[in-house]
């Protein structure tokens, strides 16, 4: 793939040349896996998604021009899958399985375009909402986040001259490459790019993916970004997300249905996928509650992705549960992906080496680490914690508790109700940086 002079491209920036979202598959692979399940099993459910800036001190409406934001959102709505993309999705093997996407689903997807959005301002923040059919609104999550993050980066760099931009990107490349050099010390490492949603820019994410591909070779197992996987001949990686149990819980009519919501989703997932896609995301309503009530068959799944507890504490809790269930952790897989940088990756790898199979999803600190790279400090280049979460399903409020109270989302009264129902044990309050 030809190298792009990112600094020159930024300095000579023209919007028509560089739309932020270039393709509907410039998204995370698990969005397509989940979309097929939603399309097949929940076609009539409505769900709303809402942008949430957890870094309250950053006033996004003051940093990002509303006209530019609308331009980018409107452009994303014009996109449809290309013939090349359709052929690749239909003909490629994912996770060792051919035709993972059903022909009827792909036929529907071939005509898909992103639905309308609602945008306003309140107290220095953007209020960005997506309402409608779940199988349509779900696809806004990743492009909306990528647009907001890249517009913030562009705004921060707008006044920089060509030489300053050269220095900025040269330092960022050197910083990222120094991380690659440290990862080479870990024999048997398996790591993938999870950095689409909060990336500095598409071009920077592509550079990081190419650098990992060359720098650590087979240890780099792929990217969650479907477009980059296709263009770079890499594995598209990813399993499932919190939105599935969040919607199932919101739709629950009884306490029993609420308690069983996470396990119902796993049963639904197993109807469509198997093998290495049988990865449990346990923390939507707290990992302790999930493990306490989990049916024994959950222990037969391939692995877990502990997403909001500190990685070592979260991993140990799951290993203890596997042992309690009579399973050998050495045959199981833990995927660590929450706010990781190279120090946490190395510490976690060395802690669990030989005790469990491991894989790492490297996100924001891979694709958006420009701290200390500008000749003078530019706060707009520091990543923020911004998410796009389900806010309601069929008009009923949706909640995520998480193992970290700082990551809880939903109406405060509903969050409190869920806490009383599922319990609040073993939750660890940590500052959320990304």
From Swiss-Prot:
<dbReference type="Pfam" id="PF17767">
    <property type="entry name" value="NAPRTase_N"/>
</dbReference>
<protein>
    <recommendedName>
        <fullName>Nicotinate phosphoribosyltransferase</fullName>
        <ecNumber>6.3.4.21</ecNumber>
    </recommendedName>
</protein>
<comment type="function">
    <text>Catalyzes the synthesis of beta-nicotinate D-ribonucleotide from nicotinate and 5-phospho-D-ribose 1-phosphate at the expense of ATP.</text>
</comment>
<keyword id="KW-0597">Phosphoprotein</keyword>
<dbReference type="GO" id="GO:0004516">
    <property type="term" value="F:nicotinate phosphoribosyltransferase activity"/>
</dbReference>
<dbReference type="Pfam" id="PF04095">
    <property type="entry name" value="NAPRTase"/>
</dbReference>
<comment type="similarity">
    <text>Belongs to the NAPRTase family.</text>
</comment>
<dbReference type="InterPro" id="IPR007229">
    <property type="entry name" value="Nic_PRibTrfase-Fam"/>
</dbReference>
<dbReference type="GO" id="GO:0005829">
    <property type="term" value="C:cytosol"/>
</dbReference>
<comment type="pathway">
    <text>Cofactor biosynthesis; NAD(+) biosynthesis; nicotinate D-ribonucleotide from nicotinate: step 1/1.</text>
</comment>
<dbReference type="InterPro" id="IPR006406">
    <property type="entry name" value="Nic_PRibTrfase"/>
</dbReference>
<feature type="modified residue" description="Phosphohistidine; by autocatalysis">
    <location>
        <position position="242"/>
    </location>
</feature>
<dbReference type="InterPro" id="IPR041525">
    <property type="entry name" value="N/Namide_PRibTrfase"/>
</dbReference>
<dbReference type="InterPro" id="IPR040727">
    <property type="entry name" value="NAPRTase_N"/>
</dbReference>
<dbReference type="GO" id="GO:0034355">
    <property type="term" value="P:NAD biosynthetic process via the salvage pathway"/>
</dbReference>
<dbReference type="InterPro" id="IPR036068">
    <property type="entry name" value="Nicotinate_pribotase-like_C"/>
</dbReference>
<keyword id="KW-0662">Pyridine nucleotide biosynthesis</keyword>
<keyword id="KW-0436">Ligase</keyword>
């Amino acid at each position: 793939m030809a190298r792009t002079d990112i600094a020159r491209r930024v300095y000579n920036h023209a919007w028509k040349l560089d739309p932020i979202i270039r393709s509907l598959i410039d998204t995370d692979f698990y969005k397509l896996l989940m979309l097929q399940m939603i399309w097949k099993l929940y076609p009539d459910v409505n769900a709303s998604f809402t942008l949430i800036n957890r870094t309250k001190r950053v006033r996004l409406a003051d940093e990002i021009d509303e006209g530019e934001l609308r331009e980018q959102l409107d452009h994303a709505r014009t996109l449809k899958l290309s013939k090349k993309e359709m052929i690749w999705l239909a003909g490629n093997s994912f996770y060792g399985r051919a035709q993972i996407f059903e022909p009827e689903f792909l036929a529907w997807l071939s005509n898909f375009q992103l639905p309308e959005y609602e945008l306003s301002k309140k107290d220095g923040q953007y209020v960005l909402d997506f309402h409608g059919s779940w199988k349509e609104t779900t696809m806004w999550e990743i492009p909306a986040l990528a647009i907001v993050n890249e517009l913030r980066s562009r705004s921060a760099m707008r006044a920089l001259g060509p030489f300053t931009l050269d220095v900025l990107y040269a330092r960022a490349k050197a910083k990222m490459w120094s991380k690659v050099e440290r990862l080479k010390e870990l024999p048997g490492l398996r790591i993938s790019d999870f950095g689409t949603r909060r990336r500095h820019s598409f071009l920077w994410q592509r550079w990081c993916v190419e650098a990992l591909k060359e720098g650590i070779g087979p240890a780099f197992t792929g990217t969650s970004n479907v477009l980059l996987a296709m263009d770079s001949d890499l594995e598209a990686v990813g399993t499932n997300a919190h939105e599935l149990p969040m919607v199932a819980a919101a739709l629950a009519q009884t306490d029993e249905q609420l308690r069983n919501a996470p396990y119902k989703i796993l049963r639904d997932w197993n109807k469509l996928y198997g093998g290495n896609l049988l990865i449990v995301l346990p923390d939507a309503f707290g990992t302790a509650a999930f493990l306490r009530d989990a049916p024994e068959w959950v222990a037969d799944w391939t692995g877990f992705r502990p997403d909001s507890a500190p990685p070592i504490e979260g991993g140990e809790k799951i290993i203890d549960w596997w042992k309690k269930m009579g399973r050998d952790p050495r045959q199981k897989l833990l995927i660590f992906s929450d706010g990781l940088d190279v120090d946490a990756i190395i510490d976690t790898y060395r802690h669990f080496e030989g005790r469990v199979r491991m894989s790492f999803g490297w996100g924001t600190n891979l694709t958006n680490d420009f701290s200390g790279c500008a000749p003078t400090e530019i706060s707009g280049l520091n990543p923020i914690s911004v998410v796009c979460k389900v806010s309601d399903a069929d008009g009923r409020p949706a909640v995520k508790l998480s193992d970290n109270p700082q990551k809880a989302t939903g109406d405060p009264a509903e969050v409190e109700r869920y806490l009383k129902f599922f319990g609040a044990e073993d939750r660890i309050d940590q500052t959320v940086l990304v």
